[in-house]
Amino acid sequence: MGDVLKAYFVPNGSYLMEMAEDGDKVSAVETLQGIGREIRDVLRPDATTMASPHWLPRSAFFVDDSAQHESFNDYPLRPAPFGRRFFSYSAAGDPVLARAIVASAREAGVPVGTKVYGLDHGAFCPLKVMDLGGIPTVPVSTSRRSFDECVRWGEAVRRAAQSAGRRVVVISPGNLTHRLDLRGDDERESYLPLGAKFDQIMIDLVTSGRSADIATIDPEMLREAAPEADGRPLYFLAGVTGHARGELLQYQGMKYSVGDATFAFEPAAAGVAR
């Protein structure tokens, strides 16, 4: 019987691939690797659905229904003296699941289309660190559409897993505070004080099953913290999981003022939501 087995909110910075390659003992990397083992060895899904926070069209939501997906390098490289590193990733697709997502969204009145897109680093970085190359994946966009539509988009993805008879793990990367504009050589290890406060509010919302209530946060704080994609990855997950509570697996206020958090979600029973 098809359904979403589990869902995850994970970090997606390209630095995670470097840390994993170097064997660094960093909580974000070790947690991603642990999730990868759980997906491969315990959950054993038919496919994953990956919603990159960097694929942000305005007109609609999109699905890549290709039979094969290749990564492309859209992330900034470090200056050559510090050792530039290119990474790549390939994964089989699942056109049947992809088409089911499109049909499910259309039936719900969610604007949707197909597009050959591939895997940007928001998608392939966590997939590579989790080592999920042997599992088919369906890349789907996030979107600049309304928060309500992002929730409905998540609901459509879950219904599609059910109708297609696919056992699916959904991964929606992002960061809490996301102020990369503050990076600088003199503050590489610092963290924005407001970011720590904002991140705790976000953690409290997600762990209490209120991921879709981000807009209730003070508007000025939201503007200053600038969560990745305005928090849309978490609205999407609220739809996917029936507003399930998220379990915080790790959190760190990273250098460059990034709130680096990982959550796992056990979806509510089909048809059950808060």
Q: What do these predicted regions represent?
A:
Residues L176-R179, G184:
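A structural signal for small-residue-enriched, beta-sheet-centric alpha/beta enzyme cores
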